[in-house]
Amino acid sequence: MANFFDLDGPSFGPKSGGKPRRLVLLLHGLGADGNDLIGLAPYFAEALPDCAFVSPHAPFPCDMAPYGRQWFSLQDRSPETVLAGVQAAAPILDAYISAQRDRLGLADRDLALLGFSQGTMMSLYVALRRPQAIAGIVGYSGALVAPHLLAGEVKSKPPVLLVHGDADQIVPFQAMGAAARALQGAGVAVDTLARPGLPHSIDEEGIAAGIEFLSRCLTAA
């Protein structure tokens, strides 16, 4: 069984060259690895110069491609199977978040999660079940797994920004609205940004919104 000691991946910053005062974990999607999102870090670092960025490779080899990693399998996309996969990976990610926090001597309020696709699903599932609220979550092109369970399992309520393209051919655009409704129903503050014509990707406007959101969350922390 993988554990948080098995997770590694590229890192960036702090841009200031000083001791990290904030931490952002970037969680990639299915079939990618940590190198997929670490390229976002320099853009975010312009607004967050004292922030360290870590982009771990997901714990499991991708079973739908000859390369890449996955947080959980999507060969069977039934809600029950997806939930079981998320629940299996959740303790690994949860322990990794805590280990990275402790390594830098930070508190939960000093860290944020940024996810893409599967990384968004994992971010939302894990962060909202941690006993202490992190500073915030940015979720690109993702979904909320098991929304019917959230209200009964939520332990903390960090603010969330969801960004999704309305031409997404992988994760339906409607997933953003469904996630927002469930999050709001559980008392979580949610901002949403729809990107016209954008497929399963992240664009400049989405990056800019993420920078503004995390700057606000981490500065207020």
Regions found by a protein language model. Name each.
Residues L162-H164, D168:
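Short beta-strand/loop motif that positions the catalytic acidic residue
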Residues Q169-A175:
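Conserved alpha/beta-hydrolase "acid-adjacent" motif
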Residues R109-S156:
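Primarily recognizes the serine-hydrolase "nucleophile elbow" in alpha/beta-hydrolase
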Residues G177-A221:
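C-terminal catalytic histidine-bearing segment of alpha/beta-hydrolase fold enzymes
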Residues P56-H57, L114, V138-S141, V163, ...:
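Alpha/beta-hydrolase-fold catalytic nucleophile elbow
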Residues G34-N35, H148, D203:
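Short N-terminal helix/helix-N-cap motif within the alpha/beta-hydrolase-1
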Residues A2-D110:
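Serine-hydrolase catalytic machinery in alpha/beta-hydrolase-like enzymes
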Residues R109, K155-V160, A186-A189:
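Short, proline-enriched alpha-helix->beta-strand connector loops that line the catalytic pocket
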